[in-house]
Design a protein with these regions (language model features):
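Short, solvent-exposed loop/turn segments at secondary-structure junctions
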Residues: 13-15, 41-45, 74-76, 141-144, ...
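Acidic (Asp/Glu)-rich catalytic clusters
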Residues: 22-33, 48-73, 83-93, 153, ...
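CE4/NodB-like, metal-dependent polysaccharide N-deacetylase domain
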Residues: 28-34, 96-145, 201, 229-240
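The substrate-binding groove and active-site-proximal loops of carbohydrate-active enzymes
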Residues: 6-16, 38-48, 104-114, 133-135, ...
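Hydrophobic faces of well-ordered beta-strands that scaffold small-molecule active sites
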Residues: 6-10, 35-37, 68-71, 135-137, ...
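Active-site beta->alpha N-cap acidic-glycine motif
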Residues: 1-67, 76-77, 128, 269, ...
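C-terminal domain-boundary segment and adjacent tail
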Residues: 1, 35-39, 215-286
Length: 286
């Protein structure tokens, strides 16, 4: 493939602060960049189709060419669909302490039956609200398990985006700028066949978590460096973000992406796509 596919993803639509989600939609309209939003079907204990403000915004997102896929069920637990990776637990000390204290208890909640039930309930609300079945999934806090992947396959899901290429974005969240976290050797920066036949489409990292203007250059340097490295190996550039952590008083995150979009466009061989379009174009290498 001669072009680089760039897919921005964004989590937790359907949760709190819809006005901040609307701010992100306005930014994306101006930038003409499609995004894959991972939507909470039962956020804050309320079904998505009982939230008229969110329904209007999500319909606007679809009309603008964005993609909506399933995110968790209600995002009520760090361990909702499995155990998050270590670099994620490092920024959630209470969850890390619980995992270290009672791993058997945590894992008891990840049976195939329980994972299947949560996915089925979330999928049903999603279909009822939006009129189609989701084919992609992301767990809350990147929490996943083998049983979750099997349950996704059993419910007709095609792909997930939960694995991480470069954990440094989370080290930056903890202000651990000198961690030297390497790219993960077992996570390629492109789609590949994973557990239970599900296609995994990894994210490279998260770069825009509650940034201040003083963070701008450091985080832009990280995201551009990762982008250039992905291009050098012929991979796909998929990033994670959260609408409420890059809007409102935290719009430095939008400025980081504004700079990266401008840089990417200057190269002339970059295409902005949703995750499903990325998969259609790139395929799954043998």
């Amino acid at each position: 493939m001669t072009e680089t596919l760039f897919a921005l993803t964004n989590d937790d639509a359907g949760g709190s602060a819809p006005e901040l989600f609307e701010e992100l939609l306005d930014f994306l309209d101006a930038q003409q960049v499609p995004v894959t939003f991972f939507v909470l079907p039962h956020g804050q204990g309320t079904p998505l189709d009982s939230k008229p403000e969110w329904m209007a915004l999500l319909k606007r997102a679809l009309k603008s060419g964005h993609e909506l896929q399933l995110h968790a069920f209600d995002h009520s637990s760090t361990f909702e669909f499995g155990v998050p990776p270590d670099f994620m637990l490092d920024i959630i000390p209470d969850a890390k302490a619980r995992w270290e204290r009672e791993p058997e208890v945590v894992q008891q909640a990840h049976t195939l039956e329980l994972m299947s039930d949560r996915i089925a309930r979330g999928k049903a609300i999603f279909e009822r609200a939006l009129g189609y079945a989701p084919t992609g999934f992301r767990g809350p806090c990147l929490s996943m398990s083998a049983n979750t992947y099997q349950a996704l396959a059993n419910h007709g899901f095609v792909w997930s985006s939960n694995e991480v290429v470069n954990p440094m974005g989370w080290r930056y969240i903890n202000k651990d700028y000198d961690a030297g976290e390497p790219w993960q050797p077992n996570v390629p920066p492109h789609p590949y066949r994973y557990t239970a036949g599900i296609i995994e489409i990894p994210m490279v990292s998260e770069y825009t978590w509650y940034l201040t203007p003083e963070d701008m250059d450091r985080h832009y340097d990280l995201i551009r460096s990762d982008f250039d490295r992905v291009r050098a190996v012929g991979g796909t550039f998929l990033t994670l973000s959260h609408y409420y952590a890059m809007t409102g008083e935290w719009t430095t995150g939008l400025r980081v992406y504004e700079r990266l979009f401008e840089y990417a466009r200057s190269l002339g061989d970059v295409r902005f796509v949703t995750v499903s379009r990325l998969l259609d174009a790139y395929g799954v290498p043998d």
